[in-house]
């Protein structure tokens, strides 16, 4: 599950410094109160083409939360927008492999050197939040190598932290089964209210008009993403809250001729909402450090009454979008760039089937 490209400063940094981790990402299972700590280890590799005098070798792991928001001034004398910004470091860990300030600078012959490191990341840490221009929660490894002669070397490698929520409470079928205004009975159901980013939401519809000659014009469904941000400025000013709502994906369905017959007592059909595969188009549900993202499925039903008037039925179903560790999300999508979606996916890129739609696992049978 790749993240943004590696970054560094100094001559031929990519050929000199590297960080190899024992896992591609940190995975927390459950809420911040339930998740167990995760052990992460790795190796910092340094390749020198010539003898070099080293002043220090350090490795940092930092977690940073950034939030920014624009607001329109409500005072007549003050026009224009004001930008609120907040940034704070909530996690920091440093490894000093060599410190020239405490020891004499070290002359290192040409060759390849490896420095192992490890860390235990507590399950209460917030998950990475990417894909939003106005907010982010990110983790970053930074290598600093000071040289007596020549430019110092720095190298960055991001670390993604994923939290998979408890899927059991929302993993069963959910349906709204009601009679609306004594005009129409309906049943709208989804198989699972917990959905992995990049998969789909299947919606089943059943409508039974209670009035003669009442017809359904169209059904529109939208996945709405709601972002609530709390900004505490770095300059100590007053806090600021902001909310934005975005339509992630939508579907509009007009009933065809097969449903126009008056003899039909009910309308039954199914529709699908395909979720984006890029974090720049959809963000997983989260509520950490003043960054809250939630989703709901909004359904709008337009109906023609026998007297010629129109009626509208509006419904909303809360859903939880999570980032699956088994599904590929597009790298660099956190920058808000438009990432073209592929026409086809390789089998290795596909998400595991939704709950209730999987096949029984087959036992391994060795061949004779």
From Swiss-Prot:
<dbReference type="GO" id="GO:0031625">
    <property type="term" value="F:ubiquitin protein ligase binding"/>
</dbReference>
<comment type="subunit">
    <text>Interacts with hulA.</text>
</comment>
<dbReference type="InterPro" id="IPR014752">
    <property type="entry name" value="Arrestin-like_C"/>
</dbReference>
<dbReference type="Pfam" id="PF00339">
    <property type="entry name" value="Arrestin_N"/>
</dbReference>
<dbReference type="GO" id="GO:0009410">
    <property type="term" value="P:response to xenobiotic stimulus"/>
</dbReference>
<dbReference type="InterPro" id="IPR014756">
    <property type="entry name" value="Ig_E-set"/>
</dbReference>
<dbReference type="GO" id="GO:0005737">
    <property type="term" value="C:cytoplasm"/>
</dbReference>
<dbReference type="GO" id="GO:0070086">
    <property type="term" value="P:ubiquitin-dependent endocytosis"/>
</dbReference>
<protein>
    <recommendedName>
        <fullName>HECT-type ubiquitin ligase-interacting protein apyA</fullName>
    </recommendedName>
</protein>
<comment type="function">
    <text>May be involved in signaling by recognizing appropriately phosphorylated substrates via its arrestin domains and then recruit a HECT-type ubiquitin ligase such as hulA, leading to ubiquitination of the substrate, providing a link between ubiquitination and phosphorylation in protein regulation and stability.</text>
</comment>
<dbReference type="GO" id="GO:0005829">
    <property type="term" value="C:cytosol"/>
</dbReference>
<dbReference type="Pfam" id="PF02752">
    <property type="entry name" value="Arrestin_C"/>
</dbReference>
<dbReference type="InterPro" id="IPR011022">
    <property type="entry name" value="Arrestin_C-like"/>
</dbReference>
<dbReference type="GO" id="GO:0031396">
    <property type="term" value="P:regulation of protein ubiquitination"/>
</dbReference>
<dbReference type="GO" id="GO:0030674">
    <property type="term" value="F:protein-macromolecule adaptor activity"/>
</dbReference>
<dbReference type="InterPro" id="IPR050357">
    <property type="entry name" value="Arrestin_domain-protein"/>
</dbReference>
<dbReference type="GO" id="GO:0005886">
    <property type="term" value="C:plasma membrane"/>
</dbReference>
<comment type="similarity">
    <text>Belongs to the arrestin family.</text>
</comment>
<dbReference type="InterPro" id="IPR011021">
    <property type="entry name" value="Arrestin-like_N"/>
</dbReference>
<keyword id="KW-0833">Ubl conjugation pathway</keyword>
């Amino acid at each position: 599950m790749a993240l943004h490209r590696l970054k560094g400063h100094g001559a031929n940094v990519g050929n000199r410094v590297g960080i190899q981790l024992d896992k591609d990402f940190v995975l927390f299972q459950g809420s911040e109160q339930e998740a167990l700590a995760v052990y992460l280890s790795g190796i910092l590799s340094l390749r020198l083409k010539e003898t070099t005098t080293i002043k220090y070798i350090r490795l940092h792991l930092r977690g940073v939360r950034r939030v920014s928001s624009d607001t329109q001034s409500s005072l007549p004398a003050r026009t224009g927008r004001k930008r609120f910004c907040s940034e704070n470091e909530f996690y920091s860990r440093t490894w000093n492999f060599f410190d020239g300030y405490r020891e004499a600078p070290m002359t290192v012959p040409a060759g390849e050197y490896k420095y192992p490191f490890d860390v235990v990341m507590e399950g209460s840490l917030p998950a990475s939040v990417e894909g939003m221009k106005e907010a982010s929660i990110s983790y970053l490894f930074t290598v600093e190598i000071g040289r007596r002669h020549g430019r110092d070397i720095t190298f960055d490698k991001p670390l993604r932290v994923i939290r998979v929520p408890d899927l059991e409470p929302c993993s069963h079928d959910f349906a709204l089964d009601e009679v609306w205004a004594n005009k129409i009975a309906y049943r709208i159901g989804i198989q699972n209210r917990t959905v992995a980013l990049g998969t789909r939401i299947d919606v089943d519809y059943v409508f039974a008009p209670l009035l003669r000659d009442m017809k359904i014009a169209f059904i529109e469904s939208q996945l709405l993403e709601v972002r609530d941000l709390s900004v505490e400025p770095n300059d100590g000013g007053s806090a600021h809250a902001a909310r934005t709502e975005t339509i992630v994906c939508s579907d509009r369905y007009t009933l065809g001729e097969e449903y126009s017959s008056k003899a039909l007592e009910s309308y039954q059909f199914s529709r699908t909402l395909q979720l984006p595969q890029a974090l720049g188009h959809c963000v997983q549900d989260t509520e950490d450090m003043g960054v809250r993202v939630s989703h709901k499925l909004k359904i709008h039903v337009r109906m023609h009454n026998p007297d010629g008037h129109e009626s509208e039925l509006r419904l909303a179903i809360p859903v939880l979008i999570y980032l699956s560790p088994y599904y590929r999300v597009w790298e660099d999508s956190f920058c808000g760039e438009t990432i073209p979606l592929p026409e086809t996916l390789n089998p290795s890129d596909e998400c595991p089937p939704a709950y209730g739609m999987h096949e029984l696992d087959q036992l391994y049978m060795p061949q004779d």
